[in-house]
UniProtKB/Swiss-Prot annotation:
Gene3D superfamilies with a match to the protein in the record: 2.40.50.100, 2.40.50.150, 3.90.1100.10, DNA-directed RNA polymerase, beta subunit, external 1 domain, DNA-directed RNA polymerase, subunit 2, domain 6, RNA polymerase alpha subunit dimerisation domain, RNA polymerase Rpb2, domain 2
Keywords, ordered alphabetically: DNA-directed RNA polymerase, Nucleotidyltransferase, Transcription, Transferase
Cited NCBIfam families: PRK00405.1, rpoB
Lineage, top ranks: Bacteria, Pseudomonadati, Chlamydiota, Chlamydiia, Chlamydiales
Family: Belongs to the RNA polymerase beta chain family.
Protein's recorded name: DNA-directed RNA polymerase subunit beta
Superkingdom of origin organism: Bacteria
GO BP of this protein: DNA-templated transcription
CDD domains attached to this UniProt entry: RNA_pol_B_RPB2
The EC number(s) this enzyme carries: 2.7.7.6
Any one Gene Ontology cellular component term annotated for this protein: DNA-directed RNA polymerase complex
Gene (name only): rpoB
GO molecular function terms noted in the UniProt entry: DNA binding; DNA-directed RNA polymerase activity; ribonucleoside binding
Catalytic activity, as annotated: RNA(n) + a ribonucleoside 5'-triphosphate = RNA(n+1) + diphosphate
Function: DNA-dependent RNA polymerase catalyzes the transcription of DNA into RNA using the four ribonucleoside triphosphates as substrates.
Length: 1252
């Protein structure tokens, strides 16, 4: 069995822990959303279940009818993912929901069909209308509370806070220049500000005394004589002081005590007063109490309502319901668990499960936030403003959450429809059932819209396995509820200290999206709240343990973290007394005794693709960014070759991308061919697992997906072994390019400006040859004029043109085609307008339906040539039009199918019985198993399981068995669930096959009779103009393909395969390519593969030692000889092996010339671009160039008849036909457009003919 090569490394110890599953971010999130495989009562209140529980129950307006949600049930997919791609349909499951409706007639339960939900494939993708798509995770501002500061024009710093809910109105509070705090509700209504004290009163703190008690420490001071005045003058009263007998007010809460007031109180016999110990007259709360226009809860509510809804009558009931709706109704205001967690953590409240379940706002939250804001204002060192770009304040919405939000909006729409239907239903004539009120359209339409149109649902980049993997790990700050690329500033795009180990600082696109679209770091995970976590090893008493702790960005700020490269002895203790650490976002040297944690690996900083760049630490960051992005554009080659110099991530990247086939259990290979591998299970050789290989499929980007087996019959394999290679992989390792012998030298000026010179030998050996597959589709429809027909009888076409078409009008597989060739012959009825007048008259008289047809065949577009590799035909079958022979054949086919289905069911039952026996036979029942419906005890506690009991369990449905939680029963539940799913899948497959035999492809679009897809494969060799690149951002275009004999050669006669410009290294500062060249030369000579992981690779000294061991020059430079003259070049040249990739920017796809094509309607100029068969733009600067030469006639031609002179175009055509050499140009259409535009501005411009 072919296994990936052992790579030599200088790294002493492997990483702890191993990398997590790289597409977990997608799979885990969607699994939690759907909770497939869980029983209804076992489902947690998350995902789809949470949405249903939130929206239901729905009550009618008079509350006489109630619709309750009970549970949902997901079906089994009708087709496999591969079949869905082939048919161009969506890979989905049906969603059925059980509702209970209660009205005056009684209680009715019913299961209602709610449409379909797309299902995620094992690779973390969705198949929508036959195309693989990925839902990109979105990074957005976390719900919760943020404290900010801004500078006023007068120089004062104004502090503010925002409480951002997951859903609902934002609440903002900001200090003004007079130290008063104003509340704003929703940013849109910013001008409607409410004094904070008024808002607090409206929340229920009606008296001034209540408010003072919330914000200050209350103390009681005695008032016996005038000696006590000194202590009390200037203090703030905490409560109203009223003489109960006379109702005389001596002082109000919030007032400053004066000598006169104290004298009056002393005279009235008041013995003590309550004061606010830590308050003074300049305190914001005291200032606001003085400014507050209201003095009671009712007045505050009305004032709040008046400011929020000016012009509407401010009644108490209206005001109360408004404030309740805004902040205290869970349907309209929801902080979410995340928002509550952030808010409680910031304000010092509890973060246990009970506290986190409170999703609406509380009075205590507003009071706590205002207290914190005042502490900020007062300069409290423990209070600090938040950094909104810190990852503690940004969270990730993964696929499950994004779709959950869509489902919520769809069901909210449905809620209105349900209420309307309940209201309008006529109970006298019919009985109301759940099916009559529930509409499935709302949910289906939002899901269809999201997967088809959302900015976050993207057509998967499938150029190579790395592109696919990175696309699933991508994080976007764009999309609904996110940022806008035009308005996003530098701060949000920049690398932040909290990104360490969470978001890759290197991999991001160049251009307008820089920093907004990023990638998850290698070890990063997303926690239950959506925050990105990264792992650290725990350090205890100076010893680095193997215990791992995943930490979010805010928790990490409190820890002292050492680098992964810090040196340790054999006891995992630091060898040095000081080391570099990170603490609170800063890096510095510190004593090792203070260290609490340590990085798990140096590569936890970067993403997977960046981690594939060897010697990354020697490259400039800008070039590393280009290197990361260009690896995703590498085209899978015909002959793959793993890099000699790798980083050790190649195996893992290939495995998790889903490109290769990995063994799911131990066993022995029983059968192998190009299409499948059959493995007999180790524990029971009669149980066989078949791995189907993908053969010559077209990827989203037109490249070829092909898997080849790596094992032979009799090979022993263990779980996790690679049993088949895929595109761009070599023995289970990623192989995007080729190891090429390069020389860094100028050569006759051909490698000017990064151009690349390659040897003809690479072309001859098909080193950089790739296969592209193009899909062409044609449909025959039933039109108003008659049916379209796919046929070989095409009018006015010669037999030579039809030579490759079969009897049915479809091209044969294996035919070589070039532009213009017919792939599928089709004729379509001509419409009346296309007929001559006399023909139309005859038709009108004789009433004959259009008999004349026109050619509507599918032809090969310009620029495409290749071999027809596959043809797929989909058609509907009409039972009435079938012949007797066809019906007999169908019956035989159905009989065979039924027999096969019965055998499969029998095999499955046997397999299941064996597993049940192995688990239960002669084991003691840990607890009783009860039948849910009949309440009968199926298995008594302590009973020994015998064959009869096992058979009884086997016959029952899992839903009907009530089992207590214990280890044995958990395994039993899993077995039962797997068996029922497998049985269901077999039944669906059988029914689908039967349907296909009887009715053909019933899922074709309406009106389509037949659909034909033709796949043309073309071999693309490397040619001049193709773009190539290394892994260090060293890109260039092939400028010349040189005969092998003319290439420079070494003293041993070996020719160089590629020549690169040495000037591409110093200014680009990507020295990684030079080190790779040297190490590649040494490793290739030694016949070994090496890995040089990011930040812990081969030191230079080790590379020189390796080169000396292999007898290579120590400086990596050799004398070369000119292939043309045989003379030696004057100076030594750096030569070695470098891994070069061919990128998907092929010249064959870009080169274009227009012969005939469309014109723009307004300007009458040819359109632009290859897709429109457009012309080349001859712009202003090009006109200057011709003017400089003085070529008047050429200029006149280009600006008139070759462009937009409509009459002149016709005349020049006539001249060419007649053989005249004459140019009579007219007025360019663009001149007329200019005049019309000026007239549109109200200027009276008219061209006038003036006699010469």
């Amino acid at each position: 069995m072919l296994k990936c090569p052992e790579r030599v490394s200088v790294k002493k110890k492997e990483d702890i822990p191993d990398l997590p599953n790289l597409i977990e971010i997608q799979i885990k999130s969607y699994k939690q959303f759907l909770q497939i495989g869980k029983l209804a009562e076992e489902r947690e209140n998350i995902g789809l279940e949470e949405v249903f529980r939130e929206i239901f129950p729905i009550k009618s307006y008079n509350e006489a009818t109630v619709l309750e949600y009970l549970s949902y049930n997901l079906g089994v997919p009708k087709y496999s993912p591969e079949e869905c791609i082939r048919r161009g349909i969506t890979y989905s499951v049906t969603l059925k929901v059980r509702f209970r409706l209660t009205d005056e007639t009684g209680i009715k339960e019913e299961e209602v069909y709610m449409g379909t939900i797309p299902l995620m494939t094992d690779k973390g993708t969705f198949i929508i209308n036959g195309a693989e798509r990925v839902v990109v995770s979105q990074v957005h501002r976390s719900p919760g509370i943020n404290f900010e500061q801004e500078k006023h024009s007068k120089g004062n710093i104004l502090f503010s806070f925002r409480i951002i809910p997951y859903r609902g109105s934002w609440l903002e509070a900001i200090f003004d220049i007079n130290d008063l705090i104003y509340i704003h509700i929703d940013r849109k209504k910013r001008r409607r500000k409410i004094l904070a004290i008024t808002f607090i009163r409206a929340l229920g703190y009606s008296s001034d005394a209540d408010i003072i008690e919330e914000f200050f420490t209350i103390g009681e001071s005695s008032l016996r004589s005038e000696k006590d005045f000194a202590l009390l003058v200037g203090r703030i009263l905490a409560d109203n002081i009223i003489d109960e007998a006379s109702s005389l007010v001596y002082g109000k809460a919030g007032e400053k005590l004066s000598t006169a007031m104290l004298k009056r109180m002393l005279d009235a016999g008041i013995a003590s007063v309550k004061i606010a110990v830590d308050a003074d007259e300049n305190h914001p709360i005291i200032k606001m109490l003085a400014k507050d226009p209201t003095d009671s809860y009712e007045a505050a509510l009305k004032d709040f309502y008046r400011r929020l809804r000016p012009g509407e009558p401010a009644t108490l009931a209206n005001a109360r319901s408004t404030i309740m709706r805004l902040f205290f109704d869970p349907k309209r205001y929801n902080l979410g668990r995340v928002g509550r967690y952030k808010l409680n953590r910031k304000l010092g409240f509890s973060i246990d499960d009970e506290a986190l379940s409170q999703v609406t706002l509380r009075k205590e939250d507003v009071i706590g936030a205002l207290k914190y804001l005042i502490r900020l204002k007062m300069g409290d060192e423990k209070a600090c403003v938040d950094d909104i770009d810190h990852l503690a304040n940004r969270r990730v919405r993964s696929v499950g959450e994004l779709i959950q939000n869509q489902c919520r909006s769809g069901l909210a729409r449905m809620e209105k429809i349900v209420r309307e239907r309940m209201n309008l239903f006529d109970f006298s004539s019919d009985t109301l059932t759940p099916g009559k009120v529930v509409s499935a359209k709302g949910l289906a339409s939002v899901l269809k819209d999201f997967f088809g149109r959302s900015q976050l649902s993207q057509f998967m980049d499938q150029t190579n396995p790395v592109a696919e993997l990175t696309h699933k790990r991508r994080l976007s700050a764009l999309g609904p509820g996110g940022l806008n690329r035009e308005r996003a500033g530098f701060e949000v795009r920049d690398v932040h200290a909290s990104h360490y180990g969470r978001i890759c600082p290197i991999e991001t696109p160049e251009g307008p999206n820089i920093g907004l679209i990023t990638s998850l770091s290698s070890f990063a995970k997303i926690n239950e709240f959506g925050f990105i976590e990264t792992p650290y090893r725990i350090v205890r008493d100076g010893i680095v343990t193997d215990e791992i702790e995943y930490m979010t960005a805010d928790v990490e700020e409190e820890c002292v973290i050492a680098q992964a490269s810090a040196s340790l002895d054999e006891y995992n203790m630091f060898t040095e007394p000081v080391c570099w650490v990170r603490y609170a976002g800063e890096a510095f040297e510190a004593d090792t005794s203070t260290v609490t944690h340590m990085d798990v690996s140096p590569k936890q900083l970067v993403s997977i693709v960046t981690g594939l760049i060897p010697f990354l630490e020697h490259d400039d960051a800008n070039r590393a960014l280009m290197g990361s992005n260009m690896q995703r554009q590498a085209v899978p080659l015909l002959k793959t070759e793993a890099p000699v110099v790798g980083t050790g991530l190649e195996c893992r990247a290939a495995k998790d991308s889903g490109a290769i086939v990995v063994a799911e259990e131990d066993g022995v290979v029983d059968f192998v061919d190009g299409y499948k591998v059959v493995v007999a299970a180790k524990h029971n050789p009669t149980i066989k697992r078949t791995y189907h290989l993908k053969k010559f499929l077209r990827s989203n980007s037109g490249t070829c997906i092909n898997q080849q087996p790596l094992c032979a019959v009799g090979d022993v394999i263990t779980k996790g072994d690679v049993i088949a290679d895929g595109p761009a992989t070599d023995r289970g390792e990623l192989a995007l390019g080729k190891n090429v012998l390069v020389a860094f030298m100028p050569w006759y000026g051909y490698n000017f400006e990064d151009a690349i010179i390659i040897s003809e030998k690479l072309i001859r050996e098909d080193a950089y040859t790739s296969i592209y597959i193009e899909e062409f589709e044609l449909t025959a429809r039933d039109t108003k004029l008659g049916k379209e027909e796919i046929t070989r009888d095409i009018p006015n076409v010669s037999d030579e043109v039809l030579a490759n078409l079969g009897e049915d009008g479809i091209i044969r597989i294996g035919a070589e085609v070039k532009p213009g060739d017919i792939l599928v012959g089709k004729i379509t009825p001509k419409s009346e307008t296309e007929l001559a007048p006399e023909e139309r008259l005859l038709r009108a008289i004789f009433g004959e339906k259009a008999a004349d047809v026109k050619d509507a065949s599918l032809t090969v577009p310009p620029g495409t040539e290749g071999v027809v590799m596959d043809v797929k035909v989909f058609s509907r079958k009409d039972r009435l039009s079938k012949s007797d022979d066809e019906l007999v054949e169908e019956a035989v086919h159905l009989k065979d199918l039924q027999k096969g289905y019965k055998n499969q069911v029998a095999t499955l039952k046997t397999e299941y019985r064996e597993k049940l026996g192995a688990l239960l036979l002669n084991e003691k029942a840990p607890a009783a198993i009860i039948h849910r419906r009949t309440a009968e005890i199926v298995v008594h506690e302590g009973l020994l399981f015998d064959q009869e009991t096992i058979e009884r369990i086997e016959q029952e449905d899992l839903v009907d068995l009530l089992m207590p939680n214990c280890e044995m029963y958990e395994v039993l539940k899993g077995l039962l669930s797997d068996y029922e799913t497998a049985l269901q899948r077999l039944e669906i497959n059988y029914k689908t096959e039967v349907e296909h035999i009887r009715e053909g492809d019933a899922d074709l679009d309406h009106g389509v009779i037949r659909q034909v897809k033709v796949y043309v494969a073309s071999k693309r060799k490397l040619q001049v103009g193709d773009k190539m690149a290394g892994r260090h951002g060293n890109k260039g275009v092939v400028s010349k393909i040189v005969p092998e004999a003319d290439m420079p050669y070494l003293s041993n006669g070996e020719t160089v395969q590629m020549i690169l410009n040495p000037l591409g290294v110093p200014s680009r500062m990507n020295l990684g390519q030079v080190l790779e060249t040297h190490l590649g030369y040494a490793a290739k000579t030694a016949g070994i593969y090496v890995k040089t992981p990011v930040f812990e690779g081969f030191p230079e000294q080790r590379i020189w030692d390796m080169m000396i061991e292999q007898g290579l020059p120590e400086d990596g430079k050799s004398f070369l000889y000119d292939g043309k003259t045989g003379e030696r070049f004057d100076n030594k040249v750096v030569i070695g092996y470098i891994y070069m990739l061919k990128l998907s920017h092929l010249i064959a796809d870009k080169i274009h010339a227009r012969s005939i094509g469309p014109y723009s309607l307004v300007t009458q100029q040819p359109l632009g671009g290859k897709a429109q068969m457009g012309g080349q733009r001859f712009g202003e600067m090009e006109v200057w160039a011709l003017e400089a030469y003085g070529v008047a006639h050429m200029l006149q031609e280009i600006l008139t008849v070759k462009s937009d002179d409509v009459s002149g175009r016709t005349r020049i055509y006539e001249s060419i036909v007649k053989g005249e050499n004459l140019l009579r140009s007219g007025t360019p259409e663009s001149f007329n457009v200019l005049i019309k535009e000026m007239q549109g501005l109200g200027l009276d411009v008219r061209p006038m003919v003036v006699d010469a």
